[in-house]
């Protein structure tokens, strides 16, 4: 359950008969010599915990001490909690030494637009409970203005008022994702202001973390990867051309071969070197978007994608576009247009004005969700194929295929895993688990569209399905998936992923992106 946090206990290590969760093998931002700007003595921060039962929660506090500049290997900070105390009287604030990766700046307060925004079923939120903010998913909007929130870590469902909730955000690469929605005053600009408010290449580069961008490019772009390449050549600034990587060159350059550009002989594809700041993956498709006046778009013209602005809506199948760089006005069909997106620190960012996509999350489920109760025995027959979520440390948010062998007492059962072996390495592993840790096999589904950033998925890894979030969309139907408990980022093919579903009160809550079979 989501219990009050009093003091930190040391839990016993997990048994090693299962393969552990993905462990963080990549250097974190905390390993850099330069400390994040928000880590200063006295600075307010939010603090997370690695302790079992508290993962997914954030507590307010302040920084007491930071790593010494003379100790290059130190990544530890001392913090003091605002709402947690050593004593029952609440007079001695709890102090603790934590890793820098467990700290982030305080989440931004909701904007006026977000305060008026409806919280819908399926929305990811943080709920203030037992002195901290806990990550959960809205499963029901109640008539009394309250919301039922399901917490995956504890398998609990609790009701909250709207003022006890905030929209969930992640602190990634020094920025909040998704970013804070703009205020009404900022959105109420005239169409003329929108047309004049363009970002040039220098504005985009100002938002780029060079080290992060270099590392991402080195990881993503190998030989054969489909990419887009831009140029600083006069007359071509801001235009992106389709290409593929021939081979990496040195630490931060790539030899690319263009798809539509030719050498002087007009036959062989043009090849040239480009650096990590001028290469990116192809942006995700947006066929279903209706363009509006003021939208910043890319138009395919003369073998490349050029930046323009919509000045006239759809008429007779075409849209009017204005190109600032050449001062030209032209009309294009829908197939030759796409919303403009910037590739910044490994994420796709939409323009702040015009062309803004708001993707409301919905789910297909019975909204009359009952208060949480233990899984009933009668739900599963002996021999039924099931999935089991182990209670051991290191296996949170993972599910393993098994079958039900027998029930033991009121709330226990014996299961036999399909892919996990006993200590002899031959016989299938059998284990006694709580009935609350088992569920039926998820609904088979057909994906209506490819996965997108922030989609919650299950990734097949080390014989089990692990809950993660799509962090980056790669070429060749591949994705980078972030596992929040370990902060590990791993690459998976589409065939190794399934859309995340929750088993709540005997029903599957599933995303609108799939169709049940």
Swiss-Prot record:
Q: Name one GO cellular component term.
A: heterochromatin
What's the impact of mutating residue 461 to A? Impaired H3K9me2 binding. Disrupted H3K9me2 binding
Alphabetically, the GO molecular function entries are: histone binding; histone reader activity; methylated histone binding
What keywords would UniProt list here?
A: Chromatin regulator, Nucleus
Stretches that traverse the bilayer: none
**Where would you find this protein in the cell?**
Nucleus
Region of interest: Disordered = 1-35, 177-202
Q: Where is this region: Plant Agenet, chromatin-binding?
A: 37-111, 117-173, 219-287, 289-345, 378-446, 449-505
Q: PANTHER family this protein is in? A: AGENET DOMAIN-CONTAINING PROTEIN-RELATED
Q: Give the protein's biological function.
A: Heterochromatin-binding protein that preferentially occupies long transposons and specifically recognizes the histone H3 'Lys-9' methylation (H3K9me) marks, with a stronger affinity for dimethylated H3K9 (H3K9me2). Required for transcriptional silencing, non-CG DNA methylation (e.g. CHG and CHH regions), and H3K9 dimethylation (H3K9me2) at some loci. Mediates heterochromatin phase separation and chromocenter formation.
UniProt protein name: Protein AGENET DOMAIN (AGD)-CONTAINING P1
Could you tell me which species this protein originates from?
Arabidopsis thaliana
